[in-house]
């Protein structure tokens, strides 16, 4: 934070807005407004200016001066809760650099204008310029923050398949009987395949264990021999995907 006695051109860090020419402050706020997505040619309806004493006492909440643009005059009372000031000064929506506190929704629903001493929804101290776009007196107050996206359409529900008969007695047609027999044959085929595959794995595991003992014996008898080329290693887990078939 800068020295209050400094004559820097950076108006965003000036502790007292009354010491800054309004044109300079308005131009600075306009640049911030346009950088944040505001219309490049539209004038600012109002400017919220942070009051930052030097040094900022610990725990002190930041207050803001409100200015009506482009008249070039500051409102006399600092606003400690600028996120609600738009209702009092006909600005439909603030356009802040930082996030707005959650308590603003409660005040917005009640339609109450903020008082100068109200600290219920004060934002943390921030040396930034705030701008509020589109202050038409007759315009309806808009919700603060980014527009909410439209809710996504719910996916269509799947139609449930009719229950398949579990016995020949439940079959109502020749087609149902044929499908039932095919399902029974398929289940038997899968069960037989899994049984044979499991038996193969057990035999291969025993063979792998025998190969390991033989490999160790050959290495002890002839250390220079490339045993792995003679007796290849067998993976510990065989056909795991097929077992889950």
Swiss-Prot record:
The modification Phosphoserine is found at residues 167, 173, 186. The keyword Transcription regulation applies. Keywords: DNA-binding, Early protein, G0/G1 host cell cycle checkpoint dysregulation by virus, Host nucleus, Host-virus interaction, Modulation of host cell cycle by virus, Phosphoprotein, Transcription, Transcription regulation. The modification Phosphothreonine is found at residues 14, 159. Residues 178-195 are annotated as: Basic motif. GO terms for cellular component: host cell nucleus. The record marks 190 as: Recognition of methylation. GO terms for biological process: symbiont-mediated perturbation of host cell cycle G0/G1 transition checkpoint; symbiont-mediated perturbation of host cell cycle progression. Residues 1-167 are annotated as: Transactivation. Residues 196-228 are annotated as: Leucine-zipper. The keyword Transcription applies. GO terms for molecular function: DNA binding; DNA-binding transcription factor activity. Residues 140-167 are annotated as: Disordered. Residues 229-245 are annotated as: Accessory activation domain. It comes from the Viruses. Belongs to the bZIP family. This is Lytic switch protein BZLF1.
